[in-house]
């Protein structure tokens, strides 16, 4: 009997889904056709860079699987994850990540255990800054002031000023000696000896003062 369009058998054939159509992939189909993709990737995932040796090893494992097993990897996310974590490369990376996690936790625990010591050291540093450092700073300021006074005392201007005061003092002593001689309070011989000594001292200091002043100006 001829089957016409719209017959019951044809409608049943059209409404029955095929086995291949029922296996809907859990990833985007466009990712499978990508030549640079060595495994199914979720949408938005950045492709990982695999070395040629690792890629060859993965391909060798996939070549040993049947078509049904490959289809299951493409359609079943759990099966794919199980296969992925069975790879040596993934196992090594997971082990490294676990070791890093444990090491990080270990360092964090050590830091927490050393927290009291760190606080104690901070307190000691604060005490040093507020006490010992303050005392040392005060002593340093005192020494700086002494140094400034010494430099000021022995500066050319200060030396000339003191030399001028010494000249004036000798000049005053000479005038007082003259006054005593005029009042007959000292004899001539003693007056001449003392007056000569005073005037020699005055002129010697005057020459030094003149030489120092000339040198500082030059």
Swiss-Prot record:
The keyword Ligase does not apply. One of its GO terms (cellular component) is ESCRT I complex. Residues 137-218 form the VPS37 C-terminal domain. Residues 28-40 have a biased composition (Low complexity). It is found in: Endosome. InterPro entries: ESCRT_assembly_dom, Helix_hairpin_bin_sf, Mod_r. Residues 1-51 are annotated as: Disordered. Residues 8-17 have a biased composition (Polar residues). The keyword Protein transport applies. GO terms for biological process: catabolic process; protein transport. Keywords: Endosome, Protein transport, Transport. Gene3D superfamilies: Helix hairpin bin. Belongs to the VPS37 family. Component of the ESCRT-I complex (endosomal sorting complex required for transport I), a regulator of vesicular trafficking process. Required for the sorting of endocytic ubiquitinated cargos into multivesicular bodies (MVBs). Component of the endosomal sorting required for transport complex I (ESCRT-I), composed of ELC, VPS28 and VPS37. Interacts with ELC. This is Vacuolar protein-sorting-associated protein 37 homolog 2. It comes from Arabidopsis thaliana (Mouse-ear cress).
């Amino acid at each position: 009997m001829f089957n016409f369009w719209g017959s019951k058998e044809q409608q049943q054939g059209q409404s029955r889904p095929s086995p291949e159509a029922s296996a809907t992939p859990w990833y985007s189909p466009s990712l499978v056709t990508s030549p640079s993709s060595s495994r199914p990737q979720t949408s938005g995932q950045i492709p990982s860079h695999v070395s040629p040796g690792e890629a060859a090893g993965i391909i060798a494992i996939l070549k040993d699987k049947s078509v049904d097993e490959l289809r299951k990897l493409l359609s079943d996310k759990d099966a794919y994850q199980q296969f992925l974590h069975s790879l040596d490369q993934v196992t090594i990376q997971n082990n490294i990540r676990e070791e890093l996690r444990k090491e990080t936790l270990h360092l964090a625990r050590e830091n927490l255990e050393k927290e009291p010591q760190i606080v104690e050291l901070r307190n000691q540093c604060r005490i040093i800054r507020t006490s010992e450092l303050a005392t040392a700073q005060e002593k340093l300021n005192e020494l700086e002031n002494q140094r400034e006074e010494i430099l000021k005392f022995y500066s050319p201007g200060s030396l000339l000023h003191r030399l001028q005061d010494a000249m004036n003092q000798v000049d005053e002593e000479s005038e007082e000696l003259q006054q005593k001689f005029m009042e007959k309070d000292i004899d001539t011989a003693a007056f001449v000896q003392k007056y000569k000594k005073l005037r020699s001292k005055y002129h010697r200091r005057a020459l030094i003062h003149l030489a120092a002043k000339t040198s500082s100006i030059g």
